[in-house]
Amino acid sequence: MSFDRRCLKRVALPIAIKIVLAGERLAGITRDISPKGLCLEISTLRVKMNLLGILNTTVTLIFENEIMSGTVRWYTVEEATYQIGISIERQSKPTWKRIIDRHLRHDLSGLVKPA
């Protein structure tokens, strides 16, 4: 039996986002999103640091011309990618909401599914 602490529904939606980790800008793709956060996938080949040190630290997220702050809550390795769970900081939530709304509105394929 597993206990899921998520309080909001996740949506599987790939969005290209860059993250700044320890001063290094890395490209990633969201695995799933919610109004309060995201799961970002990054190739393990791109990450040159130990991620244990970034837990509960603030990171910068970059999407097109938008810059947001988030906190790393968890990470795991899945095949050749790191999955990093990030909660969006309060001051960045209006920006994150605009990004989510834009992507959900423009997804014409109808293939957006709950994560």
Where are these regions (language model features)?
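Short conserved beta-strand and strand-loop elements enriched in small hydrophobics
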Residues: 15-21, 53-66
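A residue-level detector for short acidic-glycine micro-motifs
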Residues: 32, 74-76, 90
